[in-house]
Design a protein with these regions (language model features):
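Conserved NAD+-utilizing ADP-ribose enzyme module
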Residues: 23-24, 40, 44-159
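Glycine-rich loop/turn
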Residues: 1-29, 36-47, 82
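Short linear sequence elements within intrinsically disordered, low-complexity coil regions
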Residues: 9, 30, 35, 64-66, ...
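Ordered hydrophobic segments in well-structured contexts
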Residues: 1-5, 29-30, 56-58, 144-146
Length: 159
């Protein structure tokens, strides 16, 4: 399958040293199966950095790796209490990072709207049930792939 990475620079060889901590699934290389979503991520990066251009780098990924047992993989098929706790742990500046040892994680993106809702939940403003209800918006869920180890990155082939 093709996976896409949006940024303000082209990425020919992904490496973890350019990855920032405290992201949804931790420090890693993030991709999407949706090219349009990757373009949006590139636009977002460009607006933050204010230099470069929008680039979408394309990679081939043999998705059988997700179930082969070769790598440690975590899959979140939907928003759930486990997903909420995983995102909160990875984004927490108060916890020792990394908080997990997965090679690859697949699951919903916590975009800006989700981040706001997570803060409300953490602050006790809304319950977990209310949070999960609010996360299910009409546009549907957007998913991301996280590659967090060198072993995982070796599964990506730039095209």
């Amino acid at each position: 399958m093709k996976l896409y990475h949006g940024s303000n620079v082209p990425v020919n060889v992904p490496d973890l040293k350019h990855s920032k901590p405290y992201k949804d699934f931790g420090r890693g290389f993030y991709l999407s199966a949706d090219r349009k979503q990757a373009v949006g991520m590139g636009e977002q990066k460009l607006s933050q950095i204010k230099q470069g251009s929008v680039y979408v780098s394309t990679f081939l990924f043999d998705e059988s790796v997700m179930t082969s047992g070769e790598l440690k993989v975590k899959i979140f098929d939907d928003y759930s209490e486990e997903w909420v706790n995983f995102i909160i742990a990875n984004r927490s500046y108060d916890r020792k990072q990394p908080v997990h040892d997965y090679d690859i994680v697949y699951g919903p993106i916590a975009d800006d709207g989700v981040t706001y809702q997570l803060r409300r939940y953490e602050g006790g403003v809304i319950s977990l049930e209310r949070l999960l209800t609010e996360l299910r918006y009409p546009k549907g869920i957007t998913f991301q792939y996280f590659f967090g180890t060198e072993r995982a990155l070796k599964c990506l082939k730039r095209i």
